[in-house]
Amino acid sequence: MTRAFYIGRFQPYHFGHHTIIKQIAEEVDELVVGIGSAQKSHESTDPFTAGERVLMVYNALENLPIRHYVLPIEDIKYNSIWVHHVASRTPHFEVVYSNNPLVIQLFREAGVCVKQSPLYIRERYSGTEIRRRMIAGEKWEHLVPKSVVEVIKEIDGVTRLRNVSASDNNSSL
């Protein structure tokens, strides 16, 4: 049995992530999805809480044909021990899927097999672009699974994003 790890901020979870996860699911038996930067929320680049993102991902993966876990992973100050931090918060996994150069470097240094995940129309399916559309009042719903739209509407996430993006003096209290 092979269990994989895939991490993202998922601000918000979109069809780019969804396509990658479906491809990973064809190669492994189980998948651990890490909600990265779990401590961040209510910021223009990170508007959603870890709990909201867990719900987005969990609901979107409801029909994934393999067992999967969705777990929050907080950032830490020391990159050199980050892999151990992740390992202490997740079930054991044999392979990591990532395109993030730092994530790749840290897991390779720790002796973990790393596979690069294919990017899926990144210029269209990116959290940055989706958040930009939300702020601008443009259509964004077609870029994310329906279940993600439902979570964002339930929490009035677009209004939150617009409010926290209105000032550059809101990064911390």
From Swiss-Prot:
Pathway: Cofactor biosynthesis; NAD(+) biosynthesis; NAD(+) from nicotinamide D-ribonucleotide: step 1/1. One of its GO terms (molecular function) is nicotinamide-nucleotide adenylyltransferase activity. Gene3D superfamilies: HUPs. Belongs to the archaeal NMN adenylyltransferase family. Coiled coil: none annotated. The lineage of its organism: Archaea, Methanobacteriati, Methanobacteriota, Stenosarchaea group, Methanomicrobia. One of its GO terms (biological process) is NAD biosynthetic process. It catalyses: beta-nicotinamide D-ribonucleotide + ATP + H(+) = diphosphate + NAD(+). It comes from Methanosarcina barkeri (strain Fusaro / DSM 804). InterPro entries: Cyt_trans-like (IPR004821), NMN_Atrans_arc (IPR006418), Rossmann-like_a/b/a_fold (IPR014729). Disulfide bonds: none annotated. The keyword Transport does not apply. This is Nicotinamide-nucleotide adenylyltransferase. The keyword Iron-sulfur does not apply.
